[in-house]
Design a protein with these regions (language model features):
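Non-heme di-metal
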Residues: 2-216
């Protein structure tokens, strides 16, 4: 299936595109879309399906082992908990192998867009249908949980899109006004419109700075 990317806002459309198509995000016309080069050499093959199955299996195993580690730790089995966590990290790397083979690991802007679209699907479609199905079968408490999680996924999408805008406009480390920057490594504070290229205290690079936030 072909993928077309809006040159204005970055929205990705999958499948055929009619001449009168309008971008659902910025309303740009079909002439503002460009075809995305396919990075998956396994597209359309049984191997591609196997790679997705392997990725899903390893990802689920990683989460399960993390949960199992918590149970073991609470029961007093420190070594077993540590082994569960170590294996979970192994599974994470296995999943990464298959995800990269599928060509799904892009640059930060692409990853933010991909993440935002995934969250959008979850709160607008997936959990909405799950909640309806649960209600139809009498599982009202679970339906409420599905809707509660959907509301959270909506905020996740909004956050990813805001971060994507920062990346695209080069505003991650440069703001329009004076703000308080904090080094994530040593805690050094800088009052400025832009984060320093290097922390003057611990010498960590600009990438370690973020706008200081207080929630206490």
């Amino acid at each position: 299936m072909q993928k077309l990317k809006c040159k204005i806002c970055g929205y990705v459309h999958e499948g055929a595109m009619e001449a009168d198509f309008k971008c659902p995000i910025c309303k740009a016309g079909a002439d503002k879309f460009e075809k995305i080069e396919v990075k998956n050499p396994y597209a359309g093959t049984k191997t591609e399906k196997n790679l997705w199955a392997a990725f899903a299996g390893e990802s689920q195993a990683r989460n399960k082992y993390t949960y199992f580690a918590s149970v073991a730790k609470k029961a007093g089995y420190e070594q077993i908990a540590a082994i569960f966590l170590q294996t979970a990290e192994n599974e994470k790397e296995h999943a990464k192998l298959w995800f990269k083979a599928l060509g799904e690991l892009g640059d930060t802007a692409e990853n933010l867009l991909h993440a935002a679209e995934g969250e959008n699907y979850e709160w607008t479609d997936m959990y909405d249908q799950f909640a309806k199905d649960a209600e139809a079968e009498g599982f009202y408490e679970l339906a409420a949980q599905f809707r509660g999680v959907a509301a959270i996924e909506k905020t996740h999408e909004e956050r990813y899109r805001a971060l994507l805008t920062n990346v695209e406009t080069k505003a991650v480390f440069e703001k329009s006004g004076i703000v308080m920057w904090e080094c994530r490594n040593c805690g050094h504070l800088v009052l400025s419109a832009s984060a320093p290229e290097k922390c003057p205290v611990c010498n960590h690079p600009q990438s370690y700075f973020e706008i200081r936030k207080e929630n206490y």
